[in-house]
């Protein structure tokens, strides 16, 4: 029996970038598609996946089974432009992660802005619109983050994904006018992200802690 069916309440429904989520809490997991069904059972509002380094095409084709069943956010890092094009038709949200592409903690922001412009231009080639978010690393300075936020808003990026401890600061910088997705490793951090005003929160929680998070979210005073 699924413990989460009782937590699918109207109060938890949320919308983001034209997408409807049954709740704002998601799970970030390994590339394995086998776990996607489990994530749905846990009650995840969305699932973030990163394509494997090998056999990417086979992996992408496997996503078709889950289309329209789970909101899929695909984290794109290696071979950004090519991978972006491959996953576009199979993703509900694409997260650009330039840090992993460069293999360092915080790539030069000029390199990042060039990458963002490339993927925004690529999106123009498609008939349907898929939102794009930028994952901002721990290593960027406040000035660098401010510059990236300005570029995102001007270039057509739909949101940023930031570590839990930076959610409040980023929202203050944008005066709560630009969507932020928090990235959290604990229940407490996930709750703080949402209470600060994050549109969504992506977690690395295992099943039981994730259940507890949904229970917290379902409480009227949360």
Name each model feature, range by range.
Residues 1-81, 214-217:
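N-terminal capping/small domains of soluble enzymes
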Residues 56-70, 109-134, 165-180, 210-222:
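Alpha-helix-loop-beta-strand connector modules within alpha/beta enzyme cores
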Residues 23-29, 45-49, 70-76, 94-96, ...:
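Hydrophobic faces of well-ordered beta-strands that scaffold small-molecule active sites
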Residues 82-139:
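Metal-dependent enolase-superfamily TIM-barrel catalytic cores that perform enediolate-based chemistry
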Residues 49-52, 93-102, 159-165, 189-216:
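Glycine-rich phosphate-binding active-site loops on the catalytic face of alpha/beta enzymes
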Residues 3-7, 98-114, 136-176, 209-216:
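Glycine/Thr-rich beta-alpha phosphate-binding loop at enzyme active sites
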Residues 36-40, 82-86, 140-154, 170-178, ...:
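Catalytic cores of alpha/beta
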Residues 31, 53, 78, 98-102, ...:
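Active-site-proximal loop/turn and secondary-structure-junction residues that shape catalytic pockets
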